[in-house]
Amino acid sequence: MEARNMTPFTYFSLPMQKLFLRNQAAVRNKPYAKYFRTEMRVPLSAVRKIQQGPMALEDTLTPSIEDINRLLEPDFVSEESGYALLPGPMAYVQSRKFFPGCTAQMFKWWFIWHPAESERYTLWFPYAHVSNPCVHHQRLCDESLSFEERLYGNTFCASEYVGDRLMHLHIDFQQPASLGLNTDLYREAKIDGSVSALMSLADHPEVPVSLMVHLFKEVPGGMYLTSRYWVGAHPSMARFPGAEKAASLLKENGFGEAELETLAYEFAVHDMCEFNHLASFLPDLYREFGTPAA
């Protein structure tokens, strides 16, 4: 894998800077404190794509079953970053991140390990992450179960900044097939795992306002994570019970077209920062603290 040009990401909103200082103090005496790092580096190429502004609609995917399965096609190559506002309205984010020296096992372990303590979650994005407890933590930690049995059907309750907005979200992890991904195509694509989910506002967990797809696959030298986020209203979301209420709920919470486009941009930046940062330390963290997740 050829070397990438990584650059420091240095702008964070004032609430995020204040959160960083609180997180830094909280993690200080933890055995993993050295992995709490000030500098966050991201691929310059990903930054430049986001700087080009919203994507053309013909280059985006919708959350329809047909479109999400394009991610599994042999000749489909995801762009490194990008965002757009889809008709609906719906925020759209796409990304593809490389994790040098990382394996699928390491990535699975991270999703088992980090919810146990808020301080662990802050390692992932020190300026944005507050807490991410798991509803069924005992099941998540049950080593007699496979990774999929521990994660799917489980809910993480994330509190995090996206831009300067503090969001409280329920992330309901699902079997890929439950979200519409074709089982045969998934197998043929040799995907090593999925941490895909429906997302809702914490105050209204019965209304999914977002579909989030994360597919990871080992390659020579590391692992790729291909991601898509859709937040808002779209006819194809009707396959998920409660999603028909998403448009009115988001509007009630101040998410009109302009706010959703801003959210798409901020989510694109957030995704770029958090996953590239995780990639920078996960292999070392796993070697020190890791145990098999499946």
UniProtKB/Swiss-Prot annotation:
Keyword tags: Hydrolase, Metal-binding, Zinc
MF-aspect GO terms: hydrolase activity; metal ion binding
Keyword flag Metal-binding: yes
Cofactor: Zn(2+)
A Pfam family matched in the record: DAPG_hydrolase
Regulation: Specifically and significantly activated by CoCl(2). Competitively inhibited by MAPG, but not by 2-hydroxy- and 4-hydroxyacetophenone.
Binding site for Zn(2+): 129, 160, 270, 274
pH dependence: Optimum pH is about 6.0.
Catalytic activity: 2,4-diacetylphloroglucinol + H2O = 2-acetylphloroglucinol + acetate
Record-stated family: Belongs to the DAPG/phloretin hydrolase family.
Subunit description: Homodimer.
Purpose of the protein: Hydrolase that specifically degrades the potent antimicrobial compound 2,4-diacetylphloroglucinol (DAPG) to equimolar amounts of mildly toxic monoacetylphloroglucinol (MAPG) and acetate.
This protein's name: 2,4-diacetylphloroglucinol hydrolase
Gene field: phlG
